Amino acid sequence: MIKIERQTKETDIVVELNVDGKGKSDIDTGIGFFDHMLESFAKHARFDVKVVCKGDIHVDFHHSVEDVGIVLGQAFYQSVFPVHNKERFGDAVIVMDESAVECAIDLSNRPFLVYEVDIDGTIGQFDAELIEEFFRAFVFNARITAHIIQKRGKNRHHLAEASFKALAVALRRALAEDKRAGMPSTKGVL
């Protein structure tokens, strides 16, 4: 279990992460829809995740969403690197009713995000553009490469949830044990 705390003038965050968990979550960011996405992420990655965030949500949700991504990404990095005896690559296509989102990842230690999901507007009170902000913060702090691409769909909630689940399942698959892999790079280091 990795525990990271981060305090700024905008947020006060505590994250606990066990990547070898069972998908249990205890999420409290004060942002209902975001909590739902993080719970779904934990469940489908099979990570045990605890997140407590006290943020300036009276201003808007941006600082809380981005900062949770930063801290969760840092916890993931500390949990996984250096990568050894793992598949390293993972992918998933997740459908939710009319929506389908694909995610492919590489535990590369080279952060890069391709995000091509067309979600404009709001989901309840949640600004949908914050989904990309979360993924960018997570990916860059986890030091992974992720491509999250919409295959079809138009319902904002479905696209968002399929995106979080696709990342979760791709991560679970990339973390699958492969004792033959050793250091899964021809460079000898990731």
Swiss-Prot record:
InterPro entries in alphabetical order: IGPD_sf, ImidazoleglycerolP_deHydtase, ImidazoleglycerP_deHydtase_CS, Ribosomal_Su5_D2-typ_SF
Which biological pathway?
Amino-acid biosynthesis; L-histidine biosynthesis; L-histidine from 5-phospho-alpha-D-ribose 1-diphosphate: step 6/9
Q: What is its EC number?
A: 4.2.1.19
Entry's Gene Ontology molecular function annotations: imidazoleglycerol-phosphate dehydratase activity
Q: Which domain of life does this protein belong to?
A: Bacteria
Give start-end ranges for the coiled-coil region(s): none
Question: What GO cellular-component annotations does this UniProt entry give?
Answer: cytoplasm
GO terms (BP aspect): L-histidine biosynthetic process
Compartments it resides in: Cytoplasm
Main localization, broad class: cytoplasm
SUPFAM superfamilies assigned to the protein according to its UniProt record, in alphabetical order: Ribosomal protein S5 domain 2-like
Short name of one Pfam family: IGPD
Annotated catalysed reactions: D-erythro-1-(imidazol-4-yl)glycerol 3-phosphate = 3-(imidazol-4-yl)-2-oxopropyl phosphate + H2O
Instruction: Please provide the record's keywords in A-Z order.
Output: Amino-acid biosynthesis, Cytoplasm, Histidine biosynthesis, Lyase
By sequence similarity, the record places it as follows: Belongs to the imidazoleglycerol-phosphate dehydratase family.
Q: Which HAMAP family match?
A: HisB
Q: What is this protein called?
A: Imidazoleglycerol-phosphate dehydratase
State the organism of origin.
Nitratiruptor sp. (strain SB155-2)
Q: State the taxonomy lineage.
A: Bacteria, Pseudomonadati, Campylobacterota, Epsilonproteobacteria, Nautiliales
